[in-house]
Amino acid sequence: MTKMTTEEAFIKVLQEHGIEHAFGIIGSAFMPISDLFPKAGITFWDVAHETNGGLFADGYTRATGKMSMVIAQNGPGITGLVTPIKTAYWNHTPLLVVTPQAANKTMGQGGFQEVEPVSYTHLTLPTKRIV
């Protein structure tokens, strides 16, 4: 079995699911993963606001039939995805939403820009928190 980092495993799963485009805003919590995008053949489209990234991802998937993903920063970035998530839901568009979060041992302690992302995305199913 080949050893790989968590970031490499995440990228491998994206590749296995045919993700070639990601839209959103990259911050420090997501940089180790985004650094692997070019080698993995994933094009990242930087946007000025997470809402735009979510709408771009929805539009890309509807126009091409290929799934993409949106990346949002924790806190305000997550709340900015409410409209795109609901738009994708009503358009029956698969939308992969990826957001960073506080470390498990510090969750719920009111850390910098901490929100519980699953509570904002309960508008649709399924929603998963991956530790």
Predicted regions mapped to residue ranges:
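N-terminal alpha/beta PP-like core and its mobile active-site loop of ThDP/TPP-dependent enzymes
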Residues: 1-123, 129
